[in-house]
Amino acid sequence: MKHILPILTITTLAAAASAQSAAASSGLSYNRVGLGYNSESKGYSLTASALIGGSNVLVGASSTIGGNNTGNGADSVSLGYVFKNVAFGADATVSVASNEAYGLNVRKDLGNSIELAASFNRDSGDNNVWGAELAYNVSKQIQLAVGYSDSNAAGAAGDGQTIISARYNF
């Protein structure tokens, strides 16, 4: 029973990859690297993601650097599938990451270089993490964002976290 969620996730990704035709472009970039600052832990995070070839399969990686809660090297790699223009022009991404973490992320290009995102993730410690982010595209390559996340984790890990990020789209 423990492995039912990973099996369902992989099956969903495989079915989506074979069934979804090329959707219209949403204007969102998934090929990017970023540096974020977490106001709660006073630490940084490095992130990178990219679509594989011309597909909707998304690979990602992240790592923490310093901070008073996480320390160095809270690393993660992920594999996901982007469903473009699912509803109201928003993209939805389902993903599975290292250490039995699962996620759903919804992103919407609001126009005028503004983007909104909402996410739900569940990690191996049975912690639910909710998040929201507002981003501004300074140029086609540079994006600035502010996000907030909260979880049901015990202690400092469950406190609300504000993250300020700068990203480079490639």
Residue ranges and their predicted role:
Residues K2-F170:
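Outer-membrane beta-barrel proteins
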